Amino acid sequence: MVFPMWTLKRQILILFNIILISKLLGARWFPKTLPCDVTLDVPKNHVIVDCTDKHLTEIPGGIPTNTTNLTLTINHIPDISPASFHRLDHLVEIDFRCNCVPIPLGSKNNMCIKRLQIKPRSFSGLTYLKSLYLDGNQLLEIPQGLPPSLQLLSLEANNIFSIRKENLTELANIEILYLGQNCYYRNPCYVSYSIEKDAFLNLTKLKVLSLKDNNVTAVPTVLPSTLTELYLYNNMIAKIQEDDFNNLNQLQILDLSGNCPRCYNAPFPCAPCKNNSPLQIPVNAFDALTELKVLRLHSNSLQHVPPRWFKNINKLQELDLSQNFLAKEIGDAKFLHFLPSLIQLDLSFNFELQVYRASMNLSQAFSSLKSLKILRIRGYVFKELKSFNLSPLHNLQNLEVLDLGTNFIKIANLSMFKQFKRLKVIDLSVNKISPSGDSSEVGFCSNARTSVESYEPQVLEQLHYFRYDKYARSCRFKNKEASFMSVNESCYKYGQTLDLSKNSIFFVKSSDFQHLSFLKCLNLSGNLISQTLNGSEFQPLAELRYLDFSNNRLDLLHSTAFEELHKLEVLDISSNSHYFQSEGITHMLNFTKNLKVLQKLMMNDNDISSSTSRTMESESLRTLEFRGNHLDVLWREGDNRYLQLFKNLLKLEELDISKNSLSFLPSGVFDGMPPNLKNLSLAKNGLKSFSWKKLQCLKNLETLDLSHNQLTTVPERLSNCSRSLKNLILKNNQIRSLTKYFLQDAFQLRYLDLSSNKIQMIQKTSFPENVLNNLKMLLLHHNRFLCTCDAVWFVWWVNHTEVTIPYLATDVTCVGPGAHKGQSVISLDLYTCELDLTNLILFSLSISVSLFLMVMMTASHLYFWDVWYIYHFCKAKIKGYQRLISPDCCYDAFIVYDTKDPAVTEWVLAELVAKLEDPREKHFNLCLEERDWLPGQPVLENLSQSIQLSKKTVFVMTDKYAKTENFKIAFYLSHQRLMDEKVDVIILIFLEKPFQKSKFLQLRKRLCGSSVLEWPTNPQAHPYFWQCLKNALATDNHVAYSQVFKETV
């Protein structure tokens, strides 16, 4: 009972984890500022964080602590330290590829000149880590301090040129090791690539080892016996030793391709072995490989395949012998007798140089391949394909794919394929097959000449065989073995397929397809067929479901075209623009009415601008692709003939009319749309306006694509235009703002794409939360958001919503104001924009008080006396003038001078005071600041009293003193007596030449010249000066005033 109880507890625990993770799906458990995509793989209990190509310069914070798979590829992170993965203890996989790609391999506009720095023990704390990808980082050596749990290590496309045993001591549990692309023509090392003897000996659990693209000159010695996959292709190995693979009895995949390559027409730097010799492989080299299933000997310059190689590898399922020199060997091929389990055989591009064979010669040994499913013989290069050429294949009951493309076949009897009932794909693409002029049942042929002529084939057509490393991965993908499918998968899924694309067929007739009634898919694209089809050409193809007639010169003169294909479901007549571009030719687009089960029709890139039939008709068609035509001509303003072109496609659900140069849609277009239309694409038309209200005509519309146009507005209220719309795509337009009630009541909307527009602001009323909560996807990146206080609600919403917004942390950014330019909307701190009433009142009050005090202090400093004067002036105007009661004068004169100027002080005391207070003459009682002011009393009060208690105020003037505040205050107080008491008490004495430009001084001299005196420079004139001063002090000023001044005062 213990075991069942333990099982029950374990099941409960697993169920609990699943429920917990499912709950996390609806809760925000990582910060939105994380610039990565976070997904959950519930069956595997994985938390996947993908930070691919996010322009990161450091590992971002906020990564969930329960992350198991972390991808940081295609960024610019310069270093890794033990703190980089702090608290990420559950990591199982780290993908850190392409953060510093070697300069020859990387982008030239963003070259990395400082290689990735990995500090010691950066990964040692990750005890659950199993997979580590460090490709494309310019590393010089294998990192040290790796955790013992590591099972996969990938170090491709670095600068590791030496493999030493001591560098691998920490990888005792490693199972997969990728060390390729560290030294080849695109990532040169300029040194000899070295592998220490027995370097891999202690890797007792190693299963997969890749040393591809490294200029390795020999198979490493003493490889682990646990290896199941060994990749040594694209190196410089010239010879395989007899014992190189002796202990690899578990090996299942061996790839030796590209050693001693065949360099003819190679689209990359290629160095053959000396004298163009083949890769030397001893006959018993593979004897120990009893479990081998895949052997690749592509481009090894082989001229002969010894049967002895395959004596002990009778489990082989895939053999690649393409791009060698085995044209003659294909006619013998005794080695095939030793391959009873072979499923896939590739003998492509083994043609003899400058030889154009009359026919293909297949060895009878092919008949022994009872398990064979795929046979590829491209690039054999021969003229005529006859039935007996394929006779060795007649009894291969499992054969499904026969690929004879790129052979430059001119004559082919297609009826021979009736004997291959189990064939699913017959590939005759990229040949020169053309029709005969008679009605014989030979099939496609040309007037053949029996002589063999010299021919140089253009074998660059198929890059699959001429790619340097067809299994190489890009920075975005880490999968290794990519499958190759030469036939259109959508065609292949229907069943037996014949591919005649890219031939020289210019005419077809029913006899060409005699005995091919079993075909389900026929590909005739890329030929020169320019005939007028009348409905008889494909009559034998009674079971045909898919016809690819693209890239020809179809002439739709008859509405009966293709009508003989009663079971046709998919028809592609794209890129048949030849006759559609000509004037005055009949085009019957209503041919569809005779195709009773047609489901999908592709008419793209035909430049259709006219049609004899006004409507297309079909009761079965569900998808119509009409891209790249000229509906702008058919729907020209004022021409209503073609507005119902699609009206009679009664079951049409998907219509693509992108790239039709439609700058506007006539009003009747929507009324002429099919009644059951669900998906409508109007992308890339240059639309400047759109009649949103007309969407009411499309009652079932679910998806509307208006991307890549020039629209500037959205509907006032989307729900008033369509109640069925679920997906709206408006990316790449010129939309600057959203209407106030844009999504009001649009509860059915699930997907909205507003990316790559010029939207600056999104208001709450435009995005009601009860609608947004129903959205599954919202795209807002690459807009021009203004992150002002008006965006408070939007910033708050994106931080709290559970709607998926791709690129939120990286590409939903601000264009302004300056402080926020380039900053992510999600990371904005708009605390200062909170509209709290108390905060607003306190802020307004404090700023008002501060401004008031600042203004008052400034005004008091600059305009005190002006304000004081204006105040009293206004007061006098209102209340009338009242003479101030002043005490009797105590002094004859108050002397105002610059007490800080020693020269002036000396003149006042030695000259002026001595002359005016001399008891021998008539003396005057003078008031001096330094002598008569009361100590401790404010300066302003002393000054005011001195002026009030003196009959006259004498100003001893210098240029320097005239600019001081003391002079200005004293002068204003003295002048105030003129305003209040109408008494002029001012006398000016200039010790320096007076200011000639002073208007006040010039006016005073004219009106009261006796009050303005100058100290003469001639000593003889001094007595006259003193006499004038005494007269001015002794006499009232008004006596000396001019008549004009008296009247003014």
UniProtKB/Swiss-Prot annotation:
This is Toll-like receptor 7. It is found in: Endoplasmic reticulum membrane; Endosome; Lysosome; Cytoplasmic vesicle, Phagosome. Residues 1-26 form the signal peptide. Belongs to the Toll-like receptor family. One of its GO terms (cellular component) is early phagosome. Residues 861-1049 are cytoplasmic. Pfam families: LRR_8 (PF13855), TIR (PF01582). Changing residue 264 to H: In SLEB17; increased NFKB1 activation after stimulation with cGMP. Homodimer. Interacts with MYD88 via their respective TIR domains. Interacts with UNC93B1. Interacts with SMPDL3B. Residues 889-1033 form the TIR domain. The chain crosses the membrane at residues 840-860. PANTHER family: TOLL-LIKE RECEPTOR 7 (PTHR47410:SF2), TOLL-LIKE RECEPTOR 7-RELATED (PTHR47410). Detected in brain, placenta, spleen, stomach, small intestine, lung and in plasmacytoid pre-dendritic cells. Expressed in peripheral mononuclear blood cells. Contains two binding domains, first site for small ligands and second site for ssRNA. SMART domains: LRR_SD22, LRR_TYP, LRRCT, TIR. It is linked to Immunodeficiency 74, COVID19-related, X-linked: An X-linked recessive immunologic disorder characterized by impaired type I and type II interferon responses due to defective TLR7 signaling. Individuals with TLR7 deficiency develop severe respiratory insufficiency in response to infection with SARS-CoV-2 coronavirus. Death from respiratory failure may occur. Residues 27-839 are extracellular. Changing residue 28 to G: In SLEB17; increased NFKB1 activation after stimulation with guanosine and ssRNA. It comes from the Eukaryota. Its main location: endoplasmic reticulum. LRR repeats lie at residues 43-64, 65-87, 110-126, 127-149, 151-170, 171-195, 203-226, 228-247, 248-275, 289-312, 314-337, 339-368, 369-392, 396-419, 421-443, 492-515, 516-540, 541-564, 566-588, 595-618, 619-644, 649-672, 674-697, 698-721, 723-745, 746-769, 772-795. Keywords: Cytoplasmic vesicle, Disease variant, Endoplasmic reticulum, Endosome, Glycoprotein, Immunity, Inflammatory response, Innate immunity, Leucine-rich repeat, Lysosome, Membrane, Receptor, Repeat, Signal, Systemic lupus erythematosus, Transmembrane, Transmembrane helix. It is a single-pass type I membrane protein. Endosomal receptor that plays a key role in innate and adaptive immunity. Controls host immune response against pathogens through recognition of uridine-containing single strand RNAs (ssRNAs) of viral origin or guanosine analogs. Upon binding to agonists, undergoes dimerization that brings TIR domains from the two molecules into direct contact, leading to the recruitment of TIR-containing downstream adapter MYD88 through homotypic interaction. Activated by guanosine analogs including deoxyguanosine, 7-thia-8-oxoguanosine or 7-deazaguanosine in a RNA-independent manner. Activated by imiquimod.
